[in-house]
Amino acid sequence: MQSLQQNIETAFEQRAAITPANVDATTRDAVNQVIAALDSGTLRVAEKINGEWVTHQWLKKAVLLSFRIADNQLIEGGETRFFDKVPMKFAGWDSERFQREGFRVVPPASVRQGAYIARNTVLMPSYVNIGAYVDESTMVDTWATVGSCAQIGKNVHLSGGAGIGGVLEPLQANPTIIEDNCFIGARSEMVEGVIVEEGSVISMGVFIGQSTKIYDRETGEVHYGRVPAGSVVVSGNLPSKDGRYSLYCAVIVKKVDAKTRGKVGINELLRTID
């Protein structure tokens, strides 16, 4: 693994000069190995180690290099065609392969090669980009988007039109992470490496980036870039110091534990916020 990482790091330093025509065999093989490992879930761009999320930047570099070494090619897609550098994950799959992998894909859902989809996941007509990791028993609902290298936990529901941001550019950014047992409401957007911690419920139409204030109304505390575990979050506003205007924020209206969440439906949690 160390030699593979070194090959990627070395090639990335020379990326501006690399083209599909001149890429050397060592670099091509290293990039292809990484993409295959991301595709199978053997490697992932970020993982939780000792309670903290760690981003493996070299894997993101490999994903970026994959665009340097590939020409656009014709991609068949049912009644239409596409033209891109990255093949589709399910190209060439037959019924037996889908049954073996153990998840459902509803047309016209699109998943790029290099994204991992775990068992018992349901992909409605949605989009999952390269480098993403979608864990077991998750629902990616209609028109939801899982961006490049985003990490989605177990038993997550990404509602219709929800967007989970990708982070290949800028490279130093960490991936957006949705931990286990979270609910992301319709048309909400979590971007710029935001972490939504385990068991949180995000209401419809909530937008959170690194600069978004996440206001806990019970404590008055303001968080940035992280939704604490078990939070129920809605969109809101905070007044300016002089009271002349207000600016958008996300508001933590309550905290719930796993026991409460198991007994109470998501809709009820969001309706009883007063």
From Swiss-Prot:
Reactions catalysed: (S)-2,3,4,5-tetrahydrodipicolinate + succinyl-CoA + H2O = (S)-2-succinylamino-6-oxoheptanedioate + CoA
Principal localisation: cytoplasm
Sorted UniProt keywords: Acyltransferase, Amino-acid biosynthesis, Cytoplasm, Diaminopimelate biosynthesis, Lysine biosynthesis, Repeat, Transferase
A Pfam cross-reference name: Hexapep_2
GO cellular component, one term: cytoplasm
Binding site for substrate: R104, D141
Entry keyword Acyltransferase: yes
SUPFAM superfamilies hit by this protein: Trimeric LpxA-like enzymes (SSF51161)
Associated pathway: Amino-acid biosynthesis; L-lysine biosynthesis via DAP pathway; LL-2,6-diaminopimelate from (S)-tetrahydrodipicolinate (succinylase route): step 1/3
GO MF annotation terms: 2,3,4,5-tetrahydropyridine-2,6-dicarboxylate N-succinyltransferase activity; nucleotidyltransferase activity
Biological process according to GO: diaminopimelate biosynthetic process; lysine biosynthetic process via diaminopimelate
Its EC number(s): 2.3.1.117
Protein localization: Cytoplasm
Main enzyme class: transferase
Domain of life: Bacteria
Protein's UniProt keywords contain Repeat: yes
NCBIfam families attached to this UniProt entry: dapD (TIGR00965), PRK11830.1 (NF008808)
HAMAP family (UniProt xref): DapD
Protein family: Belongs to the transferase hexapeptide repeat family.
Subunit structure comment from the entry: Homotrimer.
Protein name (record): 2,3,4,5-tetrahydropyridine-2,6-dicarboxylate N-succinyltransferase
Source organism of this protein record: Sodalis glossinidius (strain morsitans)
Gene name for this UniProt entry: dapD
